[in-house]
Amino acid sequence: MKRNTIDIITLGCSKNLVDSEKLMRQLEANGYKVTHDSDKPQGEIAVINTCGFIGDAKEESINMILEFCQAKEEGKLKKLYVMGCLSERYLKELALEIPQVDKFYGKFNWNELLADLGKAYKSEFAIERTLTTPHHYAYLKISEGCDRKCSYCAIPIITGRHISRPMEEIIDEVKLLVSEGVKEFQIIAQELTYYGVDLYKSQKLPELIERIANVPGVEWIRLHYAYPAHFPEELFRVMREHDNVCKYMDIALQHISDNMLNKMRRHVSKAETYELIEKFRREVPGIHLRTTLMVGHPGETEEDFEELKEFVKKVRFDRMGAFAYSEEEGTFAAKEYEDSISHEVKQQRLDELMALQQEIAGELSQTKIGKEFKVIIDRKEGDYYIGRTQFDSPEVDPEVLIKADEEYLKIGEFYKVKITAADDFDLYASIL
């Protein structure tokens, strides 16, 4: 057990990771040594940043808390604190059920931890973070919360209404990160396309992205978690005109059947969804689309599911994730619908959909053989350097593998490569 050392454990999404990075910077500014995502306690104090989005995430968070409680009981840890979405939603219940935790914080009051440690929040470091990602890329969170009322989603209950960060503050953070060596920015929010409506009374995402693109040193900008309804089409122009805005869009569509879109309260139709996809591909040639789909929402019939599969076959998404509906208390779906589709049927539909996408992804990968791409090198792993094209986001998308014996490559640098082979997920390349 190392004195004056604090372990930060982050569960859940990249938005949580940004919160952890901000906390880490504040702790370091107060004289602590900080470790991140250690397998076991390293220091006297541990802070677990939890996720509470769906059942599996909640279970993972609870198990991690209990694991560290056990370490505390064994004398391997002096203090244990918990923050994040799970404790934001269930703070009182958790405090009663797991008294071994010294204190639970919500998602937005983690700065109180500093006071409880006898330290102070340092406002001069408000936009600074200790990056846990490789030094050349960072996640950039532009807003908190969500004003959408999708039937199945607990995020608005947990995080509250949409709050945009001031544009100047975001630009200042970008400039600071660039000065520290960051070249690539993953722009994240619960709902990107709503950015600016609360602060500036209109959608400001295109203006924000254009301003980030104009910051010297920004090489790649990638957009995550857009919403299909009321999409700001000015963004198409920004993506066309700025080479450093990746031709990539992560837009969660969830379903295609009008029956399901209505039950999910998505405020977009099947026809509008197809029209938006066609616009993306017409206005931004070569764009790669990533989406997320859901199966097993209450009311999903076999006909709805077949319609969803046909949609996937027809559109042929470059990247796709899917998950089975999980009933979340407090949501519209939990109040109004019976969770009548069995776990077995949900899993069967999920497996079918992902098998279909794997086949499509494999076919799309084969079309890249012989083509040339610019890649950034993330790391060296065994006999390969691992890189990504502009069409690949870290952690979730395919990677480009380059034989390490070919030549020495620098982590965080860009190289031109030629694709020589492909499998269902990854590409293999040689340096040009």
Swiss-Prot record:
It comes from the Bacteria. InterPro entries: Elp3/MiaA/NifB-like_rSAM, Methylthiotransferase, Methylthiotransferase_CS, Methylthiotransferase_N, Methylthiotransferase_N_sf, NA-bd_OB-fold, Ribosomal_uS12_MeSTrfase_RimO, rSAM. Residues 132-363 form the Radical SAM core domain. Keywords: 4Fe-4S, Cytoplasm, Iron, Iron-sulfur, Metal-binding, S-adenosyl-L-methionine, Transferase. [4Fe-4S] cluster 2 binds at residues 146, 150, 153. One of its GO terms (cellular component) is cytosol. [4Fe-4S] cluster 1 binds at residues 13, 51, 85. Its cofactor is [4Fe-4S] cluster. It is found in: Cytoplasm. Binds 2 [4Fe-4S] clusters. One cluster is coordinated with 3 cysteines and an exchangeable S-adenosyl-L-methionine. One of its GO terms (molecular function) is 4 iron, 4 sulfur cluster binding. Residues 4-122 form the MTTase N-terminal domain. It catalyses: L-aspartate(89)-[ribosomal protein uS12]-hydrogen + (sulfur carrier)-SH + AH2 + 2 S-adenosyl-L-methionine = 3-methylsulfanyl-L-aspartate(89)-[ribosomal protein uS12]-hydrogen + (sulfur carrier)-H + 5'-deoxyadenosine + L-methionine + A + S-adenosyl-L-homocysteine + 2 H(+). GO terms for biological process: tRNA modification. Residues 366-432 form the TRAM domain. Its EC number is 2.8.4.4. NCBIfam families: 30S ribosomal protein S12 methylthiotransferase RimO, MiaB/RimO family radical SAM methylthiotransferase. Belongs to the methylthiotransferase family. RimO subfamily. Catalyzes the methylthiolation of an aspartic acid residue of ribosomal protein uS12. This is Ribosomal protein uS12 methylthiotransferase RimO. It comes from Phocaeicola vulgatus (strain ATCC 8482 / DSM 1447 / JCM 5826 / CCUG 4940 / NBRC 14291 / NCTC 11154) (Bacteroides vulgatus).
